[in-house]
Amino acid sequence: MDDVHVSSYANLVLLNKTYSSMESKRWNRARRAFLNEQRKKGSLQCFYCYKSELKINTSGRADQATVDHYIPKSGGGDKFSSSNFVVCCHSCNQRKGNMTPQEFLDSDYIKKKRS
């Protein structure tokens, strides 16, 4: 009986890893497509602080263009829909976290960055 539970648990872990990997690949494709589309439009500017001339593929740098979920996933925002994406600098994306756009725009952090 215990072997059945162990086997079932192992299968669930494997299934979860497979699903997570597929979801990660889907997110990376959506993110890259959105950023490339925005770059072609000439709009790689942070939606929140207005920092311009952001770059793609500069991981972790202040000038890195990232994709933020306008309506946070935790608040029911669509994870893969470009209609829920905005271009955002790395700093703002890290700071915003699960805040709503209005909460973040009203924060002292953004007020200081914009001034």
What are these language model-derived features?
Residues 7-51:
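Short, charged surface segments at domain edges that flank catalytic/cofactor-binding sites
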Residues 106, 114-115:
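Charged phosphate-binding loop/patch that engages nucleotide di/tri-phosphates or the phosphate backbone
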Residues 49-55, 91-95:
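Cys/His-rich metal-chelating microdomains
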Residues 71, 109-112:
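Short edge-strand/loop segments of extracellular domains
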Residues 52-85:
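Histidine-centered nuclease catalytic patch
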Residues 37, 73-74, 92:
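Alpha-helix C-capping/helix-to-loop hinge sites
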Residues 2-4:
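Mixed-charge, low-complexity interaction segments
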Residues 85-107:
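Short Cys/His-centered divalent metal-binding micro-motifs
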